[in-house]
Regions:
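Conserved catalytic/coupling modules of large nucleotide/cofactor-utilizing molecular machines
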Residues: 1-156
């Protein structure tokens, strides 16, 4: 492609996003779809917001949520997250559990939630891993677990 003047040499059929999505488990697809759309909208709004300071409340909420999403995706080098933790964190974001946590505290909150799930909710994580999709039972357990974590989390 590069030698044919197509620069950058990106083949849509081999694109990482297309191949990556095909390799994801259904649970990841269930929570990631909405997040992808929100991130795209956030990037558009963030670019637009640079030119104007008078933003309505809805736009401000979208920008805040987008900032939280970006922070949630940050992780230290050589510290991969298991697929079941990724699903749980994205589900928590999608279901507004991070909305009242400041952007600066999102990293701490996500690490705290991950520790909570890994040390006390192994059965739930195993269900996500083995069923590979979010059904009503898993969503109910996620809601219960994340609500319990949220009641104890202190964003100091």
């Amino acid at each position: 492609l590069f030698n044919h003047g197509i620069r950058p040499a990106v083949s849509v059929g081999l694109s990482v996003s297309r191949v990556g999505s095909a390799a994801q488990i259904k649970a990841t697809k269930q929570v990631a779809g909405k997040v992808k759309l929100e991130l795209a909208a956030y990037r558009e709004l963030a670019a637009f917001a640079q030119f104007g300071s008078d933003l309505d409340a809805r736009t401000r909420r979208q920008l805040d949520r987008g900032s939280r999403t970006v922070e949630l995706f940050k992780q230290p080098a050589y510290s991969p997250k298991s697929v079941e933790i990724q699903v749980a964190l994205l589900w928590s974001l999608q279901n507004n559990f991070f909305d009242d946590i400041s952007v600066e505290q999102i990293f701490k909150a996500s690490a705290s939630l991950q520790e909570y799930l890994e040390t006390g909710k192994e059965d739930l994580l195993n269900k996500i891993l083995h069923k590979k999709k979010l059904d009503d039972e898993i969503e109910s357990e996620l809601k219960e677990a994340v609500s319990a974590w949220k009641s104890t989390f202190q964003a100091a």
